[in-house]
Amino acid sequence: MKKKILILLLLAAAGFQSHVFAQEFQFMVNLNYDQLVGSQKTDPQSMTQLQTYMNDFLNNQRWTSDVFKKEEKIKCKLNISLTRSPAVGNYEGNAQLVISRPVFNSNYETVLFTYVDKNFSFTYLPTTQLYFNENNYTEELPYILAYYANIALIFDYDSFSKLGGTPYVQKAFNLANLARNSSANKRAWDSNGDSRNRYWLIENLNSPQFLPFREGMYSYYRQGLDVATQNPVTTRTKVLDFLTTIKEVAQLRPNSVVVNSFFDAKSDELLRIMMEANPEEKRKAYAILSNLDPTKTQFYQKLAM
């Protein structure tokens, strides 16, 4: 009897531990390699293994010390398109990271951030074990994935508490610095590369000039979208306040990757929310949106009618 009780207690403890240490993410990695089909350097089976590796790495790693219930996992999509394989095991392409969050008291899921990475290159061989050490650059692919994971944590945590993502800003910044010094892909990690590359994304998020943007995310989501069902007027006020904040940030740092990527993700949502506003609020929203997101001026024109 004592043995049975002990076994039951051990099983219960194991189950409890599994629940408590549930991983943070529900990442879905989609790998498109259609442009590589037929290449002697590309084996379809290795592509399947690569996609599995990326999903497992992102979903099974422990990224925080916090407790996540299954329904609290952060939903992310990583859409990767491989366009070149200059040598066996070497791949080049682009990636799109999409971070989502549920809106309280609704069935609506909002996109927190969309980031397009045009300098996605790495080495992968199914027979080679990839190692990750956050304090020592090891391999390109796990470092890219860890960087993305921390970017996702920044936006998710900032949306639930003011500057809640700060610990992950520092982690992503450290990863980027290590990669910048060691990676062969300078276009992705170096300050002299593309102005929307990984260096500039985390530079923005780490800059004091962007603190109002990060603080505003809490107001936009937690005090705005999350109360839309009960108080849509408050939601519109918070959204307009955040747009004003973004305008002030953009004056200090024009054409930044954070602001541009924000509008890539939010234009539909912003228009939908502000279409219910009063005429004066609509005019203010249109003036800001058409100025900060000029390629979609015609799209926002409905607010000016």
Feature locations, PLM:
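Bacterial Sec-dependent N-terminal signal peptides
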Residues: 1-26
